[in-house]
Amino acid sequence: MRFVVLTMFPEVFPGPLGVSVIGRGLANGYWSLEVIPIRRFAVNSRVDDAPYGGGPGMVMRADVLGEAFEYANSTYQIKRRIFLSPRGTKFVQNSTANLVEADNVLLICGRFEGVDQRFLNYYNVEELSVGDYVLSGGEIAAMAVIDSCVRCIPGVLGNLQSLECESFVGSSLEYDHYTRPNSWKGLSVPEVLMSGNHRKISEWRVNSAATATGRNRPDLVEEES
């Protein structure tokens, strides 16, 4: 799988994507990353301009982004084109499967006040949000999307069960975890986890996941019902 990123700040990549299991996946060829500097396509050294109609901030130019997209598409045969935006469709765990199947995915990292809508309309660009909050740019959001997708690529995670037991696989959060020491600051590991009884351990984990979901994400419980 290949991710192609359009960004004003290419130096931030791969960043955290270059370490741990995601970084090993990159080094071992399970996925690849191409980073294209938007400033390479600047017009008179500018990539933005003042918004028509007035208002705060600057807007990224459609012609600049269009040239950047044309280059990316001709070079990498883009299958999905995505603009990271707080007003986009919310990116959830189930979104990863569709992206992984797309192979060549373009992630466009915005800056300033926004991008000229004509660029999004002309190239039929999807808008995707990683949450109901605003970031200074799309780079962190792009990294989150890439990380979430790459760990779903077969072979990247050493243990497939790790993926199957995670939060949002199904409609609940992940169960609580414990490791050594058995007792810490007067707090003990639940005895059932040390019992060796796999049926009881499985039941405990189901209940633990349900408790965590009801406490931290009651909206997921409501959606399921």
Curated annotation (Swiss-Prot):
Disulfide cross-links: none
CDD domains: TrmD-like
GO cellular component, one term: cytosol
Gene: trmD
Reactions accelerated catalytically: guanosine(37) in tRNA + S-adenosyl-L-methionine = N(1)-methylguanosine(37) in tRNA + S-adenosyl-L-homocysteine + H(+)
NCBIfam families (UniProt xref): PRK00026.1 (NF000648), trmD (TIGR00088)
Origin superkingdom: Bacteria
Name of the protein described by the UniProt record: tRNA (guanine-N(1)-)-methyltransferase
Enzyme Commission designation: 2.1.1.228
Entries under InterPro entries matching the protein: Alpha/beta_knot_MTases, tRNA_m1G_MeTrfase_C_sf, tRNA_m1G_MeTrfase_TrmD, tRNA_m1G_MTases_N, tRNA_MeTrfase_TRMD/TRM10
GO biological process: tRNA N1-guanine methylation
UniProt-annotated binding residues for S-adenosyl-L-methionine: G110, V130, G131, D132, Y133, V134, L135
Family of the protein in this entry: Belongs to the RNA methyltransferase TrmD family.
HAMAP family: TrmD
Assembly information from the UniProt record: Homodimer.
GO MF term set: tRNA (guanine(37)-N1)-methyltransferase activity
Keywords: Cytoplasm, Methyltransferase, S-adenosyl-L-methionine, Transferase, tRNA processing
Protein's job: Specifically methylates guanosine-37 in various tRNAs.
